[in-house]
Structure formats: C-alpha cells, structure tokens
Amino acid sequence: MIGDWESQSQITNPQCPITKMIKRLTVRNYAIIEHLEIRFPEGLTIITGETGAGKSILLGALGLIMGERADLKSLYNEQEKCVVEGIFDVSAYDIKPFFEQNDIDYDLECVVRRELTPSGKSRAFVNDTPVNLDVLRQLTGSLVDLHLQFDTLDIHNVSFQLRMID
C-alpha cells in the first residue's frame, strides 16, 4: 500500500532505507464508518477480509487524502462533515524544499487531512495549512503507492508499457 519513494517521486533519499511511512489513518463519517482510527505498526501491513468487510471503503477514504474526487453520497451522516486524516513519517526523506515551495510548515511528521462538508464543500490541509488539490496530489503521490487487485493487467496495455519504458 505504501510505496518506494525512489521509484515514485523526485523527492528521494537513496541513503535511507524505507521506514514506516504511514503511522495513522483516522476516518470520521465516511461511508459505513462513523469513526475509525488505525495505527500502523512497523513493517508490512496487509489488510484482508471477506467480501463486504470494508477494504474498498478504507481505500476510498485513503483516496480522499490523495486528492481523489469527493462524493456527498459517501457521508455516513449527511448532517455532519467527513474528515479523513493521515499521519506520515517523512523524517527519512528530503522533502523540506517541497514544503518551502508551497509555503507549508515542515515537520518530521506530515499530517494530511481532507474535509467534506454536508453542503459539498471540500477542503484539504497539509500540516494544518490549506492546500489546493494539485498540491495534495503531488505530495501524497509521493507518499502513497496503491496496488489494487487487477493492476497486473496493466502490463498488457501498450500505453502503460510505453510509460514504463520512457
């Protein structure tokens, strides 16, 4: 679920081994989730479960903090705002210039938050600084690498092959 900085981003530090990147994911008022907090341990985390257990809902919540489109239908309680927050350990990586370029406070832990109000307004924050979705996508695109069930089928797609070669 969490990817390798070197292969996914220009924000790299090849001398540092990959460490635990996502520390915590908090989800409030999203789909069937009233409130959920997941603290990720060191090492590999695999989320499994039967059909209907909520794995895709968890990925949908993660998608919100990655800048994906928000949908009012995903509110658990339509009278309250939805909040998804991820805390990432970025201490091993040289990403301070990205924060400076975007006028965001830098810390060794990066807090990424997305809020969706019942009126449909969506707001994104990095370390409590409001950011637009492009900045959010750029940052989280470096922090998160999702691999889904049928991703291996892309290898047969010519445009995917060309992107990998280029």
Language-model segments: what does each one mean?
Residues 1-19:
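Arg/Gly-rich low-complexity intrinsically disordered repeat tracts
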